[in-house]
Amino acid sequence: MICLSRSGHRYLRRVHNRVCSPLLIERSIKMALALSLLLFFPTPGTSSSSVGTKLSPFPACSITPSFEVSRIMWYVSTRGMAPRVDFEGALFSGYAPDGGLYMPEELPQLGGETLRQWSGLSYAGLVKALCSLFIGPELIPKDDLNDLIDRAFSRFRHKEVVHLCRLRNGLNVLELWHGVTYAFKDLSLCCTAQFLQYFLEKRKKHITVVVGTSGDTGSAAIESVQGAKNVDIIVLLPKGRCTKIQELQMTTVLRENVHVFGVEGNSDELDEPIKAVFADVAFVKKHNLMSLNSINWSRVLVQMAHHFFAYFQCAPSLDTHPLPPVEVVVPTGAAGNLAAGCIAQKMGLPIRLVVAVNCNDIIHRTVQRGDFSLSETVKVTLASAMDIQVPYNMERIFWLLSGSDSQMTRALMEQFERTQRVNVPKELHSKLSEAVTSESMMDEVITQTMLRCWEENQYLLCPHSAVAVSYHFQQTDRQQPSPPRCCLAPASAAKFPEAVLAAGLTPDTPADILALERKEARCTPMRKGDDWTQMLRDTIENLSRQWQGHFQNTPE
């Protein structure tokens, strides 16, 4: 059996003995998980002896004019106190052992000529081009990488994978929802799942993915790994608190490796057994547990392609110097799409970013005033996927815009975890407000936007897409001069019939969603009074026993 180093155990004891805020407790559990995965999936840049050891901060992320294909791409923690890892290490770790998020040690700089060459690529071609910059051929050879990406997008309904819809008065809507679950998360999760399976096959290992969801993440994660022979997925959903469509998308997948539990509680309550399981480092290591959440670097990497595709579709001409700008409006919750846009911007893509949020406005307050603080409660809105208190990917943005200042990033995030409030330093806030502008929309504005878009274009928006389009309407109504603008649409209106009805419109439900109601469903109840943690542990142990005969997965 592989054990934590003494320093790793000392760290965990300190965490256990401290009086922590809920945010710090949650982060500590995730750090313990990162330690375990880093030990079980060692990479060329790490060793078990270095885990838990205080290291010097890494050099700042540099911009590299030319990128050698044979060069290893390393990833460093935003907090600067963890060993660097390669792509495989970042993929399986999620959080770094010091609690930070992984970012590339170097960013390739894309000049005008490269961008002109890329302008003719399909969306899938852009994903391949970007991934080849950040995943070295020593890990996944180029032909294998291309095959994995083709396989990932093979089940998308639209031949372009994503599609730009050009509407009246300069309204461009980039539809990111043509995957199986009608949400943008299909794009990154299907690729991430292919990368996971590639390494698991190579290492002859098996993992169990545990996901707590309020709706979209669970269904997209299930679809990305359903049927995979070396992955089991356990999803806990809040029974009766998802939309009916979201719940059916999870409970009607009857593959042997998919295990769905309906919890008699809310999203916070169902997180408790998951946190308890991941807090047991030995258990996590023994059963190879991981979670496919929005802080995984692989998901951010794939989402960069949204911004490149939006730019190439909307830029008036690429024959000018400098290249013309395009404004990209990003509706966001956890800020993964926003972080992807900031990285693309840093690499040389001439986009202007607008982040659009609902009344859960922590990102808007951060951009406008440098106020990175929690509200008292999460407000329930029509744009439910954006009802988020903590946009964890802002840590990546702070690190990137501060010039890879891991010391500042660490201080900011640790203060935020302790006090749930921090004022962004003046210089960093200035850089943030230069890179990003922001708007916040109430439910009333969302429904008005959905209605107006239908009346002007006969086009149905989901409430999240409406948050972005409302910004476009504001600008055109004020006759503000602007470059071409592209609004990202993260989900289909078909998933949110309640919001469509609230806007006074008629839902348009596709046949495959209607068919869900006629399918057999399977969902194991977790009732009030049951020991949810023990139920989860028992399920994980049973899955490990089933797979031990198929994989050489017994801990040493």
Predicted regions and their residues:
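Intrinsic-disorder-associated, low-complexity terminal segments enriched in Asp/Asn/His/Tyr and depleted
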Residues: 9-11, 16-17
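Hydrophobic alpha-helical signal peptides and transmembrane signal-/tail-anchor segments
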Residues: 34-40
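PLP-dependent amino-acid enzyme catalytic core
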Residues: 8, 40-41, 52, 57-556
